[in-house]
Regions:
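Cysteine-centered metal-binding/redox modules
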Residues: 1-153
């Protein structure tokens, strides 16, 4: 995939690395659901769940529904092109400030608008923003980009 600087999110995450953008996870979930239907796996799960060693299969329907939700989680545009949440406070803030991304803001290290990223991305966005600020967008695109990084405790 060509590295496109228009896919660098305001927050420092690279939209091109997102499972919703690449479609890999949604496609795998779709294909698994199709195979499960073909094999009538619901019947197997129902039967095997009656045994103590198969008790986890009691949640088969819930698992199947989660796979369905994963199929729908797609974003082909990236946040700069109309993808992502229309209510993203990070994007709104950067646009109001007239800046290309949070790496141009002196407050990104302590910005509370970023906190909602932590459960899914850890501190990857901060490390990415530091890298973009230090090396520039082109070097960031050619180097190691983080999607998740465990925050130091």
């Amino acid at each position: 995939m060509t590295q496109d600087d228009n896919l660098i999110g305001y927050c420092g995450l690279y939209c091109g690395d997102c499972h919703g953008f690449s479609g890999k996870i949604p496609n795998l979930a779709r294909d698994l659901r199709k195979e499960l239907r073909k094999m009538r796996y619901d019947k197997f799960a129902e039967f095997i769940s009656t045994f103590s060693f198969g008790k986890d299969f009691r949640n088969y329907e819930e698992c199947y529904k989660v796979l369905g939700a994963m199929v729908k989680f797609r974003c082909r545009k990236g946040c700069r092109n109309g993808g992502g949440s229309p209510f993203c406070k990070i994007r709104i803030c950067a646009q109001k400030k007239g800046i290309e991304g949070c790496w141009l803001c002196d407050e990104f290290e302590s910005c509370k608008k970023m906190d909602f990223l932590i459960p899914v991305h850890g501190d990857a966005y901060v490390k990415n923003l530091r890298a973009i600020k230090r090396k520039g967008k082109d070097a960031f695109l050619q180097g190691k980009r983080l999607w998740y990084s465990k925050p130091k405790e």
